């Protein structure tokens, strides 16, 4: 689950992180009121969407009057913002953040953190190259990225934060400010189950103060049950409609750009299924894992999700019966096909627990379902059916 910039800044501020002040506005009138509250001279208006690249897409602008503030807010609110991180439809702009103008600044830095799977620790990354995508820095000048692994038994130590501050070229009071900021960010990361954290840019102002001008936070969705306050702030309008529906039925669904829908039980088998579809010249339309303990109802909902994607021209169902029985899956497939009125080709591969009974149920259903004898056979058949 991602947070908006205004939500991320508010959360970090609770942990002592100095952030650029801003006021949320959901209308042009509120934007004008916010502009005047911030001094009425200069302000920065930022579209609140779950996507990077807002500045280049016209989602960030400096305004110098209340008329400009109203005009720009009107241009953004109620529209979709398309950036390099969104699809062609973009993300809906329901609000804007009217921020204090902190420019000019002396320098722009970068500070971020993730859970590093290889070291199994929270790893901080910092760079003198703030204001640009960290992926670009990693590709072109990786030597400019400073990394610090945090031992979970003792947490972030002050000396580690000081070492990063020195490496960033900070001096005097800036070092103390940075140590406080990094310590607060780590505490926020751990206590709120962050999956991702970024301050980009972390600006050094002309008076020497350090300030988080932008903030990005991703929360581990598996931890939302113990973060009720954060879960309540979830903006579902920013999420893929099918992925959101899938989460309600505990289905792991990720929309892709192909035309062959996939329904599989098990993440590893799902990835292998997508790979073999591509091997035979097809393009998967989704990743969908119904889980090891799939129920009949969940399978029906999974089928509905796949077919809700208008780009789907065929469906491959690949089930290995371990905990879940293949005959139950077969009954669910039949119920779904009858309920949804499927018009695209459907290829089914069943293996394992009650696979023969499942195949028999499908064969006797009278529906246009093609059975497959193996994974390669299934992929070959669905690709051929879609290509016609």
Swiss-Prot record:
Residues at which ATP binds: 46, 53-55, 100, 103, 108
GO term, biological process aspect, one: tricarboxylic acid cycle
Pfam families per UniProt: ATP-grasp_2 (PF08442), Ligase_CoA (PF00549)
Cofactor note: Binds 1 Mg(2+) ion per subunit.
Residues annotated to bind Mg(2+): 200, 214
EC numbers for this chain: 6.2.1.5
Name of protein: Succinate--CoA ligase [ADP-forming] subunit beta
Organism: Acinetobacter baylyi (strain ATCC 33305 / BD413 / ADP1)
Gene this protein is translated from: sucC
């Amino acid at each position: 689950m991602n947070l908006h910039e205004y939500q991320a800044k508010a959360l970090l501020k609770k942990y002592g992180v100095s952030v650029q002040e801003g006021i949320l506005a959901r209308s042009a009138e509120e934007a004008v009121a916010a502009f005047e509250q911030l001094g009425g001279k200069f302000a920065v208006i930022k579209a609140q969407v779950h996507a990077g690249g807002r500045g280049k897409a016209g989602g960030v602008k400096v305004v110098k009057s209340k008329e400009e503030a109203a005009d720009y807010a009107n241009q953004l609110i109620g529209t979709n913002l398309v950036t390099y991180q969104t699809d062609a439809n973009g993300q809906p702009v329901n609000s804007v953040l009217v921020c204090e103008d902190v420019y000019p600044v002396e320098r722009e830095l970068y500070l971020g953190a993730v859970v590093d799977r290889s070291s199994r620790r929270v790893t901080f990354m910092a760079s003198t190259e703030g204001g640009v995508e960290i992926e670009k820095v990693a590709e072109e000048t990786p030597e400019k990225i400073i990394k610090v692994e945090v031992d979970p038994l003792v947490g972030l130590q002050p000396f580690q934060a000081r070492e990063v501050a020195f490496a960033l070229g900070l001096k005097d009071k800036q070092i103390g400010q940075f140590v406080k900021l990094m310590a607060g960010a780590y505490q926020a990361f751990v206590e709120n189950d962050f999956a991702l954290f970024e301050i980009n840019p972390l600006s050094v102002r002309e008076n020497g103060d350090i300030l988080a001008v932008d903030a990005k936070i991703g929360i581990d969705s598996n931890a939302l049950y113990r973060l009720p306050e954060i879960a309540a702030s979830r903006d579902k309008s920013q999420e893929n409609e099918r992925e959101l529906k899938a989460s309600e039925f505990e289905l792991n669904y990720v929309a892709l750009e192909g035309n062959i829908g996939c329904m599989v039980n098990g993440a590893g088998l799902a990835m292998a299924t997508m790979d073999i579809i591509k091997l035979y010249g097809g393009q998967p339309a989704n990743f969908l894992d119904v889980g090891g303990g799939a129920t009949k109802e969940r399978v029906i909902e999974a089928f509905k999700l796949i077919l809700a994607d208008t780009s789907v021209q065929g469906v491959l169902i690949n089930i290995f019966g371990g905990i879940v029985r293949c005959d139950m899956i077969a009954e669910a497939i039949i119920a779904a096909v009858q309920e949804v009125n499927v018009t695209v080709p459907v290829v089914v591969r069943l293996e394992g627990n009650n696979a023969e009974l499942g195949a028999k149920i499908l064969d006797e259903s009278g529906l246009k379902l093609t059975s497959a004898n193996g994974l390669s056979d299934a992929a070959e058949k669905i690709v051929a059916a879609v290509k016609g």
